[in-house]
């Protein structure tokens, strides 16, 4: 009930509800009511599960007819846009850390790594704001924002992984970097497409007496898509987003029940993820940084 009150309060004052859930997590954390949660690996796992569900649901809501006119600029924003954002932000961090009064002096590659972790738009926040606020955006801006926010995470993820590998291996060649990008994009897109087709086939061919099991079957397919893509060295987030687009743009049995289930589950994991992130933040530790 408290979470519902927080959500209603955010909607009433025009504040994104997810931001309030982040604050609630901070208030319940070790510097607030004393709830201890400091396991970054568990938080990462929760984030992976949540983001997979959020991106799949976002893909289901993305219609080919809406994104077709803005497909090219949307892809450019989610690839080159993220790359340029990481580059310029990294250069700014490197320049700022070199100032005498900062006393940090970060190397350029470390600055680029920090910038890469924040270079993408948070798809959970964008989807939530566009849906809850019911914004009447013109010139196909809404589908472009949804496409960009849903497809830019793989680029930021790959930038981060490549830069970490570069640091750990004391340097990678340009061919290796380009090859890593190509493999993750191609394998992720191909796996998402074919497993999305397989999910459609299973939903339409399987005869299950209990209709409530169809959404559960699709949810298990989301995790299967992410896992198999990751094993093949592809990008799992791109795969689940494309698989969601395939499912959402084709005829499937029990569409209403599936959409209702996925919408509720998406909101649940958005709340869980931001509460978890809030619990990881200790305001007292930020004083020295500030």
Regions found by a protein language model. Give the residues of each.
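Transmembrane helical cores of multi-pass secondary ion antiporters/exchangers
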Residues: 1-290
